[in-house]
């Protein structure tokens, strides 16, 4: 995994610079997302890993599936990745690109896990509090984990805010043991 990220980083940075220069950040997000999902399909993934399939044929297959979604620069990127045997790292390129884009747009990704489904007004209030605290726009991924018993656990950047009942119980247990 770390090796794939290391390989993907220069590609992601180059794509980001290209997208930023041409003002097409959102377009590149869409293109990378679409092609990433296509190559993660098991049938396409098997073709990519097959050494008997020449790169020209692989390029034809990928373009036949998602050519309408790609602009000329997108096609060049896919061709380059195929020629260099790096097409399988496209999901990591997409992930790193999204991180660079979010950083550029001053958007922080937050993962919010709650014990119960949050109402829309609760989520909006929570996001607005996080935006004030971190002084950035916050984009939230929300999930439910009944194991928290109550409350929420928020991961944003490298910080964790655990205001769940299970988190408080674990903290009390650790205090009592010491």
Swiss-Prot record:
It is found in: Cell inner membrane. The keyword Repeat does not apply. Keywords: ATP synthesis, Cell inner membrane, Cell membrane, CF(1), Hydrogen ion transport, Ion transport, Membrane, Transport. It is a peripheral membrane protein. Its main location: membrane. One of its GO terms (cellular component) is plasma membrane. This is ATP synthase subunit delta. The lineage of its organism: Bacteria, Pseudomonadati, Pseudomonadota, Betaproteobacteria, Nitrosomonadales. The gene is atpH.
